[in-house]
């Protein structure tokens, strides 16, 4: 005669199956979370680098020779916002540059923005980006402070593909 109920053996088998499934799912969720941080990080890098490139195109100069269209039209502020190579002097310059020419009235605004805000580094959780100057070596560990030619993370971690995030 069989009684309805759960035996100890059935409970142990069920518990073992649940533990095996959980041990497989946990590493997959960690990899998935890291991958989503990498995607967000890569997008922030693209946005900031595109903003730097647009700034360079508009405020380009070679020493005292003004080359970029906004640099030519805003001679008074050109040397204040761009380095001798035409790159922004700081990352904050990408948040807004005050236009001094008549173009400000044509555009209807006196501020030219390249970024809406400075994004947080998803790898560190802070806006602690590190920079590289135009004249710095590609593997430079310190920033010269003259301009912002490139941005990188402060994180020393390795990516899922085995490269360092700093090298992205």
Residue locations for each model-derived region?
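Short, charged/polar micro-motifs that form catalytic or ligand-binding hotspots
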Residues: 31, 35-38, 80-84
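Low-complexity, acidic interaction segments enriched in glycine
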Residues: 54-168
């Amino acid at each position: 005669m069989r009684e309805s109920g759960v035996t100890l053996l059935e409970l142990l088998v069920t518990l073992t199956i649940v533990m095996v499934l959980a041990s497989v799912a946990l590493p997959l969720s960690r990899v998935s979370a890291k991958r989503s941080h990498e995607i967000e990080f890569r997008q922030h890098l693209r946005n900031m680098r595109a903003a730097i490139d647009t700034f360079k195109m508009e405020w380009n100069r070679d020493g005292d020779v003004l080359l970029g269209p906004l640099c030519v039209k805003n001679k008074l502020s050109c040397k204040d916002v761009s380095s001798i190579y035409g790159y922004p002097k700081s990352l904050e310059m990408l948040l807004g540059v005050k236009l001094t020419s008549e173009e400000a009235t044509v555009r209807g605004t006196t501020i030219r923005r390249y970024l809406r805000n400075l994004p947080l580094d998803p790898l560190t959780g802070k806006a602690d980006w590190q920079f590289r100057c135009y004249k710095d070596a590609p593997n430079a560990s310190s920033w010269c402070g003259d301009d912002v030619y490139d941005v990188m993370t402060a994180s020393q971690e390795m990516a899922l593909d085995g490269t360092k995030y700093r090298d992205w």
